UniProtKB/Swiss-Prot annotation:
Pathway the protein takes part in: Cell wall biogenesis; peptidoglycan biosynthesis
Enzymatic class: transferase
Protein name: Phospho-N-acetylmuramoyl-pentapeptide-transferase
Cellular component aspect of the GO annotation: plasma membrane
Disulfide bonds: none
Family according to the record: Belongs to the glycosyltransferase 4 family. MraY subfamily.
Organism: Paraburkholderia xenovorans (strain LB400)
Cofactor(s) essential for the protein: Mg(2+)
Intracellular or extracellular location(s): Cell inner membrane
């Protein structure tokens, strides 16, 4: 919004040309989202407290968590508010990638909001059924996947439509340009051609998988938000590189026209996340709930797909992957041993993984900070793939 205004006025005020610099707008988006979160946070906490949307705590979990019962949840609305305002103010609103990422983020946010609302307002511990939640995630994920399959390699929505129609005329058998290939980290000249169907399936799995993985990780004060900020900031660097014809050529990456604008979105997400952490650090004054976790995970997955860094997201989001695998392994092993031995057995003391460490004697703050450190190391490793190729 401000970019369009600055471009209109810059002939009369040359200093407004600074708005054309992505880095300037990224910094301003971070500051804007951060300030919105810090200013609005207390009001959001009071409102959630008045609505009596307190978090229920599992009685079979760590006993130290019982004091958290009643802490306001659904605080993810504060994050989404900061992201929305900062992105709308500082991003180029003619950019197609901005809108598809916003659609996925807020679409998943609505799903999470409905789930949280049913749990805490209607006192339904199940919230949305797994089938219902997965259905709506699939609708949004598949829509984004189909659109991105034809937009990643094109420079405008007109070209996206032309490519889509060419695919239809080919009997749904046409391949995609090299820009849409699956990129392998640390290898500069090898990529895997996915084709339209392969791209759609992979994109769907990345977006929906990332959303649920972040949601599973959200279980301790401050645990999930800092990894989201770190991974989002790292993806913002990739977006800046891929969106620049100069840097992408120098670093031997495909140039994806318009991807650089996602740096603004990632910066807004980082600022909003840090503001939320101000109130979510131990002892937390509010939790983000599904409305925040599902939305942020979907955002990370969508940005990773656009900048063709699905594998790097898997690396940098290693904490999310480990948490998800711990749940899958725990459930699978329990069901297998129950059928085999008549009694279910557990691989971990409790899943997701962060609860296993708590029950093993780690303090909550130790788990959180150590997971942050691991994520920072993984993000630096992921960023190293920019040059080590």
């Amino acid at each position: 919004m401000l970019l369009a205004l600055a471009q209109w006025l810059q002939n009369d005020a040359s200093f407004l040309r600074v708005f054309s610099y992505l880095t300037f707008r990224a910094v301003m988006a971070t500051i804007t989202a951060l300030l919105i979160g810090l200013v609005c946070g207390p009001a959001v906490i009071r409102k959630l407290t008045a609505m009596k949307v307190g978090q229920a705590v599992r009685k079979d979990g760590p006993q130290t968590h019982l004091v958290k019962s009643g802490t306001p949840t659904m605080g993810g609305v504060l994050i989404l508010l900061g992201i929305a305002v900062a992105t709308l103010l500082w991003a180029d609103l003619t950019n197609r990638f901005i809108w598809i990422v916003m659609l996925v983020t807020f679409g998943f946010g609505v799903i999470g909001w409905v789930d949280d609302y049913r749990k805490v307002v209607y006192k339904d511990p199940r919230g949305m059924s797994s089938r219902e939640k997965y259905f709506w995630q699939s609708v949004i994920g598949l829509f984004a996947a189909v659109y991105l399959a034809f937009s990643v390699s094109e420079a405008s929505n007109v070209r996206v439509y032309d490519l889509f129609m060419a695919w239809v005329r080919s009997g749904l058998s046409m391949g995609l340009p090299p820009h849409a290939d699956l990129m392998l980290p640390f290898v500069k000249s090898i990529s895997y051609p996915l084709g339209v169907w392969g791209f759609i399936v992979l994109t769907y799995l990345v977006i929906v998988g990332a959303s649920n993985a972040v949601n599973l990780t959200d279980g301790l004060d401050g645990l999930v938000i800092m990894p989201v900020v770190l991974v989002g900031a790292s993806l913002g660097v990739f977006a800046y590189v891929m969106g620049s014809s100069v840097y992408s050529k120098y670093l031997l990456f495909p140039h994806i026209a318009g991807a650089g604008e996602l740096l603004i979105f990632c910066s807004a997400m980082g600022g909003a996340g840090l503001a939320f952490l101000w109130f979510n650090t131990h002892p937390a004054q509010m939790f983000m709930g599904d409305v925040g976790a599902l939305a942020l995970g979907g955002a990370l997955g969508t940005v990773a797909v656009i900048v063709r860094q699905e594998i790097v997201l898997f690396i940098m989001g290693g904490i999310f992957v480990a948490e998800t695998l711990s749940v899958m392994l725990q459930v699978t092993w329990f069901k297998f041993t129950k059928r085999r031995f008549g009694e279910g057995r557990r691989l971990f003391k409790m899943a997701p993984l962060h609860h296993h460490f708590e029950l093993s004697g780690w303090k909550e703050t130790q788990v959180v900070v150590r997971f942050w450190i691991i994520t920072l190391m993984l993000c630096l490793f992921g960023l190293s793939t920019l040059k080590l190729r």
